[in-house]
């Protein structure tokens, strides 16, 4: 099966062909660290986390880099408001970012370069652009000359004559930089120092880098001049990613990335999420109310390129979906001993028809919703067989087939970054009793009943029931159990 991806650059699906066989260099534009991460950040981070996991599962060696923008006006404004430093603000929200991502099961990138740690590379890149005629100085600032790059607009499909004044895409009524620029489309790659702001020495005097040049330098420094996949939110296509291409390709004469992938935005009840509308939701506020795995399901049930609408109904559906998957994930732990499951799979799960169907779905431009449908199919089948086993003492499907289905479910859930650790799943179900603790209480109940202490037997049965454990007394004095 061939893995195809939708390339924003070419506006079509293409087979994934890497620069180096079996290896992928992948870069994600990260957050500007001036506040807590919100729902939109959650989608971006989880989408590319699952893409990375899937590529690794498909056998690729993935080098994944995600940056932190720690030089920015928003960070400086926050520092002024709090009477602290830009570094202190950045450090605090980087730490908060890692806490949020741990809760969401987002794996750490291989490296998290920061703009402040890449200044030498940034200055080298600006110097190269200046030497090649793509950048010019103006009163301590250095601007990129957009019209000199003939392919400008190739990613976004925009033409200069159709754009509004200013490379940000906004009309500035009184642009303070307008007098410094040779052309209103030009954008800053180095900004002259301002009083009270952090600055660094450079060939153009004290100053700090512009936003777009930071990512160009970090990609080059960490992954090389051309990478396999560049990803980010669709809101970054223009101007940020367009400007990255202009800078990097002007400097090197080589493509910055083979494939450009972008995830869609998040709306809340049909409206764009914003602080002014009062519908701005941080990850940590959301996780006070919602299971992080339900959050992951909500994100994965929509195609990554499409916008997603965050509603109470959608979240409830995702929560119910996670309950269904949890029942399937617990099947082997609840019934595996009774069904004589083996210690390890009898053959590689990649040969399983269910696994092949999952791969066929996801190979089509990371159609995780299609892959999830396979997981739900397995989980519902296991739930049905578990109920039959509890009430009839045997299953309709052979134990060997059920074991393969269960192990396939566990593996594929892991590929999607869902919780598969039994202790965590059990806790999420609502009880913390281990199998051994349950068996011990069942044994105590058995002894009490043998001694005709039925009141104690009923008490133990009720205690287990209150913790989500249902006992079923079978003929011959055998007691089986399952989690509610």
From Swiss-Prot:
A Gene Ontology cellular-component term: cytosol
Sequence motif 'HIGH' region, location on chain: 31-41
Main location: cytoplasm
GO annotation, biological process: cysteinyl-tRNA aminoacylation
Chain sites annotated for binding ATP: 275
Residues annotated as binding Zn(2+): 29, 215, 240, 244
EC number, UniProt record: 6.1.1.16
Co-factor note (free text): Binds 1 zinc ion per subunit.
Name of the top EC class for this enzyme: ligase
Subcellular location: Cytoplasm
Keyword Metal-binding: yes
Cofactors, names only: Zn(2+)
SUPFAM superfamilies hit by this protein: Anticodon-binding domain of a subclass of class I aminoacyl-tRNA synthetases, Nucleotidylyl transferase
Reactions catalysed: tRNA(Cys) + L-cysteine + ATP = L-cysteinyl-tRNA(Cys) + AMP + diphosphate
InterPro entries, alphabetized: Cys-tRNA-ligase (IPR015803), Cys-tRNA-synt_Ia_DALR (IPR015273), Cys-tRNA/MSH_ligase (IPR024909), CysS_C (IPR056411), Rossmann-like_a/b/a_fold (IPR014729), tRNA-synt_1_cat_dom (IPR032678), tRNAsynth_Ia_anticodon-bd (IPR009080)
PANTHER family listed in its UniProt record: CYSTEINE--TRNA LIGASE, CYTOPLASMIC (PTHR10890:SF3), CYSTEINYL-TRNA SYNTHETASE (PTHR10890)
Subunit structure: Monomer.
Protein name: Cysteine--tRNA ligase
Organism: Rippkaea orientalis (strain PCC 8801 / RF-1)
Lineage: Bacteria, Bacillati, Cyanobacteriota, Cyanophyceae, Oscillatoriophycideae
